Structures are given as structure tokens and as C-alpha cells.
Regions:
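Anaerobic metallocofactor- and corrinoid-dependent redox/one-carbon enzyme cores
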Residues: 2-13, 18-19, 26-30, 43, ...
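Long, compositionally biased, glycine/small-hydrophobic-enriched stretches that function as flexible linkers
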Residues: 2-192, 196-205, 209, 229, ...
């Protein structure tokens, strides 16, 4: 009998599911606790829907509860039990009925229906992350909040294949609204990103590394470290922070440390500085750096110090600052490059920055200087086939642009591909949620050429790993974007008939070989 079951991430064991221990490091007891939490979130949503209640405190619990179960977020059984206790108290408050089945119902049933139910569930987990970040900055959307109740309740209801597909596409539209909300939260709070060059070398002296996605946490840390002789470096998907005016104004935000999340156990080894995890992706810390790791928000790992927020959302990062000063950092400047040896990265090409150059881009397309635009991005991971994305970008023709976002960009963002009429060929849009920016750019180009997105010389080549990538894909499909290339493998939770439906309806295509796919896209024989 399986000790656990989880198939929500791209690296799931054998391409079918983790049953003894998670490839991510999740242990069976943690998986069981997360399943029990998910079951109770569904019951809580059902009870509130029956009463017509959607109180803010319940909405926050539903959102954060889903976020906790996202891949590489929380491995702390004690923290998960404590959060589940809060759900139990709320279940009693809303007078929810006694459960009739064990949490394993989530993964049982007819294969295609389980596939579709899982797709919606994993999409909800991704949207929960975005809604959480927006709410932390004071931004909410009633349609998004309502859909957490609807989506969770729908998971426990019987639906035909057609009804599941309709629900999933409806979710995709709502998730796009959620990404728009987070874009609004980020740009109104921190300003519109501007193109910014970021150094990967590390200066001597005390420093702190910040990883994850939470810009509010980064701002609080920057305020608390100002004038204390402690530099701050971003890591992973915090790289786009350098483009936001209200963050880049801090002169001690000096650069970017390391590469993508899956290399952290090597990158952080013997690091003479503390690391703050604001969200995923957290891997089980190794002894060589475990005493310098801190978590906050929904992130957790047993034995790792956690920085809580007070009732006003304030966090005291004094322990990190003191440890940074005590460790002292490197004694000399350190030369560190990206995966391809480059030492400078460029970020900040979000919708406002790119659309400010729209006339130049349009003229370049009309003149033939730009013949194709690729969006190559998404999650990175340790799967051997992910070098596909490096090779694909290297092989793109000189008359093409490469838009990129999320941690998949680290496969190639230190490459110098040159420029077209002063426009860099690689344009880093931002974090995974900035897929909203990418769509806005595409819509603006489509409007300028009086055509649909699918008629543009534009191809999406996406990499996925966890559930935020799932919700983004569902939003793109809901918007009618077709012929997306997806890799390095298709999700294990998509059954063969469901894959066929997506291929037939949307032209979804698994990646094959970089040159083969590139030739097919550019219709080269």
C-alpha cells in the first residue's frame, strides 16, 4: 500500500506519482497532513457556500491553506497541524457536518475525472499564491475571492468531462483577473519596472540573500538593513525586484546571488550569510548551511527559525541582520557567473517598459528586422531535459526577440544575444505572475496589427514545475492562446484522453528537440 500519493509537480517519481517519499523532499506524514488540510478546506468552503457566507477571515484561511500545500513551500508538520487546527475551529464555527469520507477521495475515481479535478485543484493552489501576495499589499478582488469558494466546492461535486472543462476554463479567466490584481498591487506599490542591469558578482562584507517572490518582505528587509553595513542580494525569482523604482532606490540592494532554485543546495553551501525564504521554492536544507536559513509567511521547515508578522504585518528581521554582521560575508569580492558564464543580467522589461518601445518594435516587425517573437519561460527544475530551453534560445535566429519570465529564464538570461535596432534580443518581463504583462504586450501588438494573438509571429515555449505554472497555462488556454509548446514533460496528472482534448482544442504541444521545434515553428523544412 502506498504511504502517500502526490503527482502535482513535474518531477514526480517515474512521471506518475510519488508514493513512498516526495522527490521534493516531502515525507509521507507531511503529504497526509496536507491532504487532510485540503479536505478540510473543501468542507469549509462547502459549509460557507451553503450559508451564503464569505467572511474575510475564512477567505484568508482558504487562500493560505492552499498556498501551504504548493510544492516546496512548507515541510513543517507542526506548522501544518497548527494551521489545520485553525481550520477545525472555523469548521466548528460554521457548523460544518462531519466528514463522510477520508481525504484520499481527492485522488480516487475514474481516471479522466480525477485528472480534471486535479487540474482544477492545482490551478487553485497557484492562484492562491498570487492572491496571497496581492492581499499582503492590501489588494483583493471579490470575483477572485468568490472563486476560491466555488472552486473548492466544485472539487467535491460530480461533473461530466465537459462540465469539468468548462469549470477549468472559467477558472483560467478568473486567475488572469488575479494576475492583473497582483500586477496592480506591485506597480501601484513599487512603481512600474524599468530595464535594469544586475550584477551577479558578490561584494566583500556582510550580506543577506532573499529568495522567493514576496516584494513586501524584501522592502521591509531593505528598510531594516539601511545604514547598517549589510548588503542585500536577490535570489531566484526575486531578481525582478531590481527593476521596481521603490526597491531599486535602496543602494544596498546590490546584486543577484546564484541561479535558479534547484541549485540552492550547491549555491548556499558554506555561504557566509543568512538566507530568507519568503515563498517557494524551499528544498530540504543541507547541514552546510541549515543554520543560516530563515523562513517567513507560509513557508516552513522543521527546526528552521520562522519570522512571524505582527498584527500590523510588520516583521522583525533583527536575527538575520545580526547573523549577517556576525558572519561577516566574504573577505574579498567574489566573481560569480550564471549558468552560461555571464556576469550581468537584465530585468525590468514588464509591459510598461516594453510598450514604451512599441513603435520601434512595430516598425522593426513591419520592416522585417524582427521576424518572430518567442516567449520562453516558466519554472525551472532539476530534470535533465531542461537544457532544452538553453539550446532553444541559443538557436533562435538573429531576427527574433525572446521574451522571458520566471525562474526558467536562468537557463539563458546571462547570454548576450545582441540587439535589434537598439532593442535587446532577450527581454526579461519578471516573475511567473508577470505572464499578465506578457499577455498585455501580445494584446497590444495584436491590436496594432488588427489581428488576434494567434495570428502574430509569436510562439510560447513554456517550462513548468509547480502549480503556479498550471494556473498560468489554464489562463492562457482560457484566453484562447493556441499552439503552446510545453515541457520538459507533460503533467503526470493529465490523462492521455485529457491531453488529447487539449491538443485537439488548443494545439498544445509537448516539446521535442530544440532544433526540431524551432524548424516547425518557423516552418523550415
Amino acid at each position: 500500500m502506498a504511504e502517500m500519493f502526490c503527482f502535482q509537480c513535474q518531477q514526480t517519481a517515474g512521471g506518475s506519482g510519488c508514493v513512498r517519499t516526495g522527490v521534493c523532499g516531502k515525507q509521507p506524514e507531511t503529504a497526509q497532513l496536507q491532504d487532510a488540510l485540503l479536505d478540510k478546506l473543501v468542507r469549509l468552503a462547502q459549509a460557507c457556500e451553503r450559508k451564503g457566507w464569505r467572511p474575510d477571515e475564512v477567505t484568508e484561511l482558504l487562500t493560505d491553506g492552499l498556498f501551504i500545500t504548493l510544492t516546496n513551500v512548507n515541510f513543517d508538520d507542526g506548522a501544518i497541524r497548527a494551521f489545520t487546527q485553525r481550520i477545525d475551529e472555523m469548521l466548528a464555527w460554521v457548523d460544518a457536518p462531519t466528514p463522510e469520507k477520508d481525504p484520499g477521495w481527492l485522488w480516487r475515481g475514474e481516471t479522466d475525472l480525477v485528472s480534471l479535478r486535479s487540474t482544477l485543484l492545482f490551478g487553485l493552489k497557484g492562484m492562491a499564491a498570487y492572491a496571497h501576495h496581492a492581499r499582503e499589499l492590501g489588494y483583493t478582488d471579490s470575483a477572485v475571492d468568490t472563486w476560491f469558494y466555488k472552486g473548492l466546492t466544485s472539487l467535491a461535486q460530480p461533473h461530466s468531462v465537459e462540465e469539468w472543462l468548462e469549470l477549468i476554463l472559467e477558472f483560467g479567466r478568473v486567475n488572469f483577473q488575479c494576475m492583473a490584481l497582483l500586477d496592480q498591487a506591485h506597480t501601484e506599490t513599487f512603481g512600474h519596472p524599468v530595464p535594469t542591469r544586475v550584477n551577479t558578482d558578490i561584494q566583500k562584507g556582510p550580506f543577506i540573500v532573499v529568495t522567493g517572490h514576496d516584494l513586501k518582505d524584501l522592502r521591509q528587509l531593505l528598510k531594516q538593513t539601511a545604514g547598517k553595513g549589510v548588503n542585500v542580494y536577490t535570489h531566484g525569482e526575486m531578481l525582478p525586484a531590481h527593476g521596481y523604482p521603490e526597491l531599486k532606490k535602496y543602494t544596498h540592494l546590490v546584486g543577484h546571488f546564484g541561479t535558479a532554485w534547484q541549485n540552492q543546495q550547491t549555491d548556499f553551501a558554506d555561504l557566509p550569510a543568512p538566507v530568507l525564504f519568503t515563498t517557494n521554492c524551499l528544498m530540504p536544507p543541507r547541514p552546510s548551511y541549515a543554520d543560516r536559513i530563515y523562513t517567513t509567511s507560509v513557508v516552513g521547515y522543521e527546526g528552521i527559525p520562522h519570522i512571524p508578522a505582527d498584527e500590523n504585518g510588520h516583521k522583525d528581521f533583527t536575527p538575520l541582520i545580526q547573523q549577517a554582521l556576525s558572519l561577516g560575508g566574504y573577505e574579498t569580492d567574489q566573481s560569480r557567473g550564471g549558468l552560461n558564464g555571464g556576469h550581468m543580467l537584465t530585468t525590468g522589461f514588464a509591459r510598461n517598459a516594453v510598450l514604451s518601445q512599441a513603435p520601434a518594435i512595430l516598425n522593426a516587425i513591419k520592416s522585417g528586422a524582427i521576424k518572430h517573437i518567442f516567449l520562453v519561460g516558466g519554472c525551472d527544475g532539476a530534470h535533465p531535459g531542461r537544457n532544452y530551453y538553453t539550446e532553444f534560445v541559443k538557436r533562435t535566429p538573429m531576427d527574433s526577440l525572446v521574451l522571458t519570465l520566471a525562474c526558467g529564464t536562468f537557463r539563458f538570461n546571462d547570454l548576450d544575444l545582441g540587439e535589434i535596432h537598439g532593442i535587446p534580443r532577450i527581454l526579461d518581463i519578471g516573475q511567473c505572475n508577470d505572464a499578465y504583462s506578457a499577455v498585455q504586450i501580445a494584446l497590444a501588438l495584436a491590436e496594432a496589427f488588427d489581428c488576434s494573438i494567434n495570428d502574430l509571429p509569436l510562439t510560447l515555449v513554456l517550462s513548468w514545475y509547480e502549480q503556479k505554472a498550471v494556473c498560468i497555462l489554464l489562463s492562457l488556454l482560457a484566453l484562447g492562446v493556441k499552439n503552446i509548446y510545453l515541457g520538459p514533460t507533460l503533467p503526470a496528472f493529465l490523462s492521455e484522453p485529457v491531453v488529447k482534448m487539449l491538443v485537439d482544442a488548443f494545439g498544445l504541444q509537448p516539446t521535442t528537440h530544440p532544433q526540431q521545434d524551432l524548424d516547425a515553428i518557423l516552418q523550415r523544412g
